[in-house]
UniProtKB/Swiss-Prot annotation:
Gene Ontology CC: chloroplast thylakoid membrane; photosystem I
Keyword Transmembrane helix among UniProt keywords: yes
Protein name in UniProt: Photosystem I reaction center subunit IX
Family listed: Belongs to the PsaJ family.
Keyword annotations of the record: Chloroplast, Membrane, Photosynthesis, Photosystem I, Plastid, Thylakoid, Transmembrane, Transmembrane helix
Subcellular location: Plastid, Chloroplast thylakoid membrane
Cited function: May help in the organization of the PsaE and PsaF subunits.
Gene: psaJ
Biological-process GO terms, alphabetical: photosynthesis
Pfam families: PSI_PsaJ
Gene3D superfamilies reported for this sequence: Single helix bin (1.20.5.510)
Length: 42
């Protein structure tokens, strides 16, 4: 039971960190390539 409580307390933290990192990455991509619906450098 203690392992279940540890998992339930760790998963929201890890998912929050993942979404913050993903949002930061998308913000930085949009800062360097604004309004890039298509990426012409491919």
């Amino acid at each position: 039971m203690r392992d279940l409580k540890t998992y339930l307390s760790v998963a929201p933290v890890l998912s929050t960190l993942w979404f913050v990192a993903l949002a930061g990455l998308l913000i930085e991509i949009n800062r360097f390539f604004p309004d890039a619906l298509t990426f012409p450098f491919f």
